[in-house]
Each structure stands twice: as C-alpha cells, then as structure tokens.
Design a protein with these regions (language model features):
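Amphipathic alpha-helical linker/stalk segments
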Residues: 22, 56-83, 118-121, 126
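Amphipathic alpha-helical interaction segments
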Residues: 11, 53, 79, 83, ...
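Short coil/turn segments at alpha/beta junctions that flank glycine-rich nucleotide-binding fingerprints
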Residues: 22-26, 91, 131
Length: 186
C-alpha cells in the first residue's frame, strides 16, 4: 500500500484530539499520539512543528467542526444552546479540548477562527436586538456567553453534583433550552 501523507496527518490529528482531550497540553505525550496514529513520532514534528502547534491544529479542527455542525440562529438562541448541548453529548472530546484550552491557553494569543466566529455571532445578535426579535435586557455578548455556558452546564460540574443530575438526555437538553428561553424572555 502506498504511503499517504494526508492520511498520516489526519491520523495524527485524530490521535492528538483524543490525547489532548484526555490529558491536556501539559499531560499529553507525543509518543502516545504517534503510537495511536500508527505513525513515527518524527512525523508529528514534520507535519506540525511542535507539540504546541499540534494542539493548536487539533483544537482548531474541533472548533471548525463545531462551527460547521452546530447551526447558529440569532433568533432562537435557546435551540442553538440545545444544539451545542447535543454536540457536547455526541463529541465530548470537543468540550474537553475547550476546557483544556481555557485552563492552559488563557493567556495565549487568540485564535482567529474563534475571534471571527464570535464577532459574527455578536453582530447577528445585535441586529436581532435592533429588530426587536431578541431581548435587550442583556448585551449581545452576554447573551452569547449565557447560551454557551447554559449548554455546558451538565458537562462542567463537579462529580458530586453531576451524580444527582437527570440521566435522560432529553430531560437535560430540555432543561438547557428552557433555561435559555427564560433568560431571553424574563
């Protein structure tokens, strides 16, 4: 079978996503990533340059996937929250990467893909507010943050509290959507 450099790069990226989501940047090991990808450790440096650059590529890959698969609707932020909840349920590694990014890269340079996406969403919410379709009780950026935080509420609690949460996914999703609706229509 001929060597496929794009396939190797993709395998490394997928292995990195799982490794970084499990261990964070500091705890991830390039030898485990290479082994999981069935690739040579040197391939990581050839394709990505460094472990930090590999994390950035893995994180950006998941963020782009998130943006492509979670439809944003400024007129229905509650359902947007529900779709975010669904994504975190279906791809928990995405949320874990976000959490590691917040912990280990809080002071790092901002990623353009996130800046651009946030700016677009805030702009669209502001327009919906001017149209009178979305509450002006909170600034647009706060509404976006509240929707995101509420969508993550079930996934970011300490185990002692999380163990008391409803186990039915539909119930948890419904709670997210209803809570965001109440924020939007107090």
């Amino acid at each position: 079978m001929p060597w496929d450099s794009q396939d190797t790069r993709r395998r490394l990226l997928e292995a990195a996503i799982m490794e970084f989501s499990a261990y964070g940047i500091a705890g991830a090991r390039v030898d485990r990533i290479a082994s999981a990808a069935k690739a040579n450790k040197q391939a990581i440096y050839a394709y990505f340059g460094s472990k930090d650059a590999l994390f950035a590529a893995a994180f950006e890959d998941r963020i782009r996937d998130f943006h492509a698969s979670v439809l944003f609707d400024e007129y229905d932020l509650a359902e947007y929250g529900g779709r975010m909840f669904d994504k975190f349920e279906d791809a928990p590694e995405t949320l874990r990467l976000v959490l590691w990014y917040q912990v280990e890269r809080a002071d790092g340079p901002p990623l353009e893909v996130i800046l651009d996406s946030n700016e677009d969403k805030v702009r669209r919410i502001k327009a919906a507010q001017r149209e009178g379709k979305v509450t002006r009780t909170y600034p647009a950026v706060a509404l976006l943050g509240l929707a995101r935080s509420t969508a993550m509420v079930w996934h970011t609690q300490i185990p002692e509290l999380a163990s008391r949460f409803p186990t039915d996914r539909r119930d948890r999703r419904d709670t997210v959507v209803r809570a965001i609706r109440q924020i939007l229509d107090p």
